[in-house]
Amino acid sequence: MSELKPLVIGDLVVEKPIIQGGMGVGISLHRLAGAVAKTGGMGIISAAQIGFREPDFTTNFVEANLRSIRREMKLAREIAPQGAIGFNIMVATKHYDMWVKEAVKAGADIIISGAGLPVSLPEYVEAAYAEMEKKPDRRIKLAPIVSSAKSAMVICKMWDRKCHIAPDLVVVEGPLAGGHLGFSLDQLSAYGADTSDVPATYDREAYDREVKAVIKVVEEYGTKYGRHIPVVTAGGIYTHEDVMHQLELGADGVQVATRFVTTQECDASDAYKQAYINAGKEDIVITQSPVGMPGRAILNPFLSQIKGGTRPAIKSCFQCLEHCDIRTIPYCITMALVYAAEGDTDHGLLFCGSNAYRAEKIDTVDNVMKELTGELA
C-alpha cells in the first residue's frame, strides 16, 4: 500500500487528501463534518438552509440560518478541535454574502462554493474580516467548484483581475456527482452520465481529459502567484481505486460525499440512509431543479409526481434562491430537501451521487476513510 500524501492548501495541511463533500439540506452538519475531520480528512458543513430545525425557521429564516452556522461550526470543533472544517455555500442562494461572512466569523478553515461561479466570494470574505475585532491566526481558504477548464479559467481570471488573488484550492466536480450538477442536460448525455446504466455508458476518458485541462489552467495561475494551487476532483469517487485514479491524473486530493451518507455519523435521518441502501441502479435519475440546474437523485413518489407533470402545492416561500419564481417553479427546493432530511422519503428530494446504489450497510466514518485511503486493503 502506498501512503497518500497530505493535502496541502497553503498553511492548512489536511493529513489525508479526502474532503467530505457538502450535502444539504441537513445531510452534512456537525456530526459528519466533525467525524471526518477527526479521522484526518476535511469535514464540510452544508450551509444550505442550515437552520431548518430552528423553531423560528419559517418566520425568521435568515437569523435561524446565521445562528445555525455558528452552532454547527462550534459543535464540529468540539468533535475535532485540531481538524480541518469548513462550509459549502451555494452561490445561487439568496443572502449568499451573509452566509459567507458568518462562516468566516464562525472560524471556518475553508469555504467551498459552487452552484454558480463565486465571483464575489473574496470581497465578502474581506468584508467579514473588516467587521471582526480579532482576526484569525490563519486566513480562511477559498475554493470555487468548477466543472470544466472553461469555468476554471473564468473564475481564476475574474478573481485575478477583480481582487488580485487566485483560489487557494479548486474543486473539479464531474458529471457523476450528486445533487446539483454544473452541466447542461446535453453535456450529461454527451458523457453518457444520464442513462439508467451509468457505469456502462459513462465516458470516463473524456472527462479525465477535462480534469487534466483544469489542472493545466490552475497551474498557470499558480505560477503567476508563486505557489501551488491544489486541485481536488469530485463526482463518482467511491473506492480506493477511484481515489488512486484521480491522483494519477494529477489531482492533489478527492472530494467524496455519497459514500459518507450511509455512515452512523451522517446527520441524515435513518430513513434517508436506508433509501440509499434500498436504491437500485435504475432508481438513480437526473431531474431539473428550481435552482436552474440538473440534479441527480433517487426516484421516489415525489420525483415520479414531478415527472408526471403534477406540481406539489407550495404553501410558503423561504426566499432561499436569488432567482426563483414561485409561480413557475416545479416545486419548492427548500421543502423538498427538508422533507428528505427529516425522513419523509416519499415526499422529499433524495439527492445522491451515481454510486448511491452500491451502498449495502450502515458503516462508520473511520471505516470509510480507511477504505478510501487503502488502509483496509
Residue ranges and their predicted role:
Residues I19, A177-V232, Y238-A377:
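Conserved active-site-proximal phosphate/metal-binding subdomains
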Residues M1-K224:
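Active-site entrance/lid segments in N-terminal catalytic domains of soluble metabolic enzymes
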